[in-house]
Swiss-Prot record:
This is Thiol:disulfide interchange protein DsbC. Disulfide bonds join C117-C120. Pfam families: DsbC_N, Thioredoxin_2. Belongs to the thioredoxin family. DsbC subfamily. It is found in: Periplasm. Residues 1-19 form the signal peptide. Keywords: Disulfide bond, Periplasm, Redox-active center, Signal. Homodimer. Transmembrane segments: none annotated. The keyword Lipid biosynthesis does not apply. Gene3D superfamilies: Disulphide bond isomerase, DsbC/G, N-terminal, Glutaredoxin. It comes from Pasteurella multocida (strain Pm70).
Length: 227
């Protein structure tokens, strides 16, 4: 990512003279960005480029590119506009998630997690408390060591197990699966996490697509979601 961004900044996009979205896509692909989808942003004069490498913002004259989050200001504070663009992709993976549903559901969160992560374990061991507060918890895999790591292969076995809920809880309690699998589902989850800007676990995505980095106690998370 840093190498790609450095290339973009050095070029400054000043040499680009494209006038439509397809030309934007082609130029960004030449610079090493993949899966590029260009659309209008909420900001006049700025285009949004959703890529496998993250989200970028490009001025319509194609002279500047911005890397980072875009927030909308409101009376309630800041709203993460960038992550909300990825909600459709998140929904596409709903059948690959390990889900712990709340009986009286009020909120749904999606957690990018790593079974070797201390605070992911803390969060999971409180799963009943989250559920009792009306919070449904959905997990996606985000092995911090990358998709070639042992943890990635363990998580692949968990997410494809006959009973993923049981397999995940067992792993959290120190009993990981004995048979490992090459990352497939895990790889897709990891890539989506990168698009959301996940750089650590647990990372929580709200129903609005906003990213909350780090662990929050059940009551604190409920307060955050109610805002």
């Amino acid at each position: 990512m840093k190498k790609i961004l450095s290339t973009l900044l050095m070029l400054g996009m000043s040499s680009l003279t494209f006038a439509n979205s397809q030309q934007v896509v082609e130029q960004l692909q030449k610079m090493g960005l993949s899966g590029v989808e260009v659309s209008d942003s909420p900001v006049k004069g700025i285009k949004t480029a959703v890529t496998d490498n993250g989200i970028f913002y490009i001025t319509e004259d194609a002279k500047y590119i911005l890397d980072g989050k875009l927030y909308a200001l409101s009376e309630k504070g800041l709203r993460d506009v960038s992550s909300s663009l990825l909600l459709d992709k998140l929904t596409a993976y709903k059948n690959e998630m390990v889900v712990y549903p709340a009986k009286d559901e009020k909120h749904v969160i999606t957690v990018f997690m790593d079974t070797s992560c201390h605070y992911c374990k803390v969060l999971h061991k409180q799963i009943k408390e989250y559920n009792d507060l009306g919070i449904t918890v959905r997990y996606l895999a985000f092995p911090r060591g990358g998709v070639q790591s042992k943890t990635a292969r363990e998580m692949e076995a968990i997410f494809t197990a006959q009973d993923p809920q049981f397999a995940l809880t067992e792993a959290i309690n120190g009993n990981p699966p004995k048979t490992l699998k090459d990352a497939n589902i895990t790889k897709k989850h990891y890539q989506l996490g990168l698009q959301f800007g996940v750089n650590g676990t647990p990372s929580i995505v709200t129903e609005k697509g906003e990213l909350i980095g780090g662990y929050l106690k059940p009551a604190d998370l409920l307060s955050e979601l109610a805002q």
